[in-house]
Swiss-Prot record:
Disulfide bonds: none annotated. The keyword ATP-binding does not apply. This is Fe/S biogenesis protein NfuA. Coiled coil: none annotated. GO terms for molecular function: 4 iron, 4 sulfur cluster binding; metal ion binding. Gene3D superfamilies: HesB-like domain. Binds 1 [4Fe-4S] cluster per subunit. The cluster is presumably bound at the interface of two monomers. Belongs to the NfuA family. The keyword DNA-binding does not apply. The gene is nfuA. Involved in iron-sulfur cluster biogenesis. Binds a 4Fe-4S cluster, can transfer this cluster to apoproteins, and thereby intervenes in the maturation of Fe/S proteins. Could also act as a scaffold/chaperone for damaged Fe/S proteins. Its cofactor is [4Fe-4S] cluster.
């Protein structure tokens, strides 16, 4: 479903080390299926995990996706890119604005 590069996993692991134990990440889509759709990533503390979430286990972390966002995040890619201007996290999803 979602691919998270090694560089992005390392970046998230570094951030998660400063959070409450057991905190992971959540990948989501706001306003899925509309022209205003936006993808995002946030912290996901243990008490925020829902029974209906999909847990995607990676080498350094687990990413949770809610059931409404899941169809819109098929083949999504998260990367952490560094160049001469600095570093940035990128999230590319092909279908967040398409009706499913």
């Amino acid at each position: 479903m979602i691919r998270i590069s090694d560089a992005a996993q390392a970046h998230f692991a570094k951030l998660l080390a400063n959070q409450e134990e057991g905190t992971q990440i959540r990948v989501f889509v706001i306003n899925p299926g509309t022209p205003n759709a936006e993808c995002g990533v946030s912290y996901c503390p243990p008490d925020a995990v829902e029974d209906t979430d999909t847990a995607l286990k990676f080498e350094q972390l687990t990413a949770y996706v809610d059931e409404l966002s899941a169809p819109y995040l098929e083949d999504a890619e998260i990367d952490f890119v560094t160049d001469q201007l600095g570093s940035q996290l990128t999230l590319k999803a092909r279908t967040p604005k398409c009706a499913k």
